[in-house]
């Protein structure tokens, strides 16, 4: 159990380091600094150390074993960069909402940082793009707004094309891209 505490804490800190790195590039350093602080709450931390396994998310492991994860629910509802936070009309089956720009940008930083943690030396922006396409974009059960999915796809595609996150530093371009995609709301 002590090893789980140490290793999980190392993963959180390493993840936060990478999120901050990308968030600074993206022009949202305060969000990068405060990113995922709920992971240190008892609800999330205790469950995570109970289900910690090297190389996989402990919350996904708990969900696999028990069918749900209280820590995952807590995490998604306390962190606005998660698409699960942006849901409405639950009595009608749920409706994904458009994430505000700064949270969509933080989600990109989050995915990149998670890729750094889980892919380790195999990480590349092409690998990350492939992961995004397989696990998010082409996953029909994802309850993310289709326009936000499209924005993320375009961003990951550009990073994969140049094998670089430099695009994040072009704040005006990224904002224009987001706005141009989100303004196509009538097409969805």
Report each predicted region and the residues it spans:
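Metal-dependent phosphohydrolase cores
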Residues: 1-188
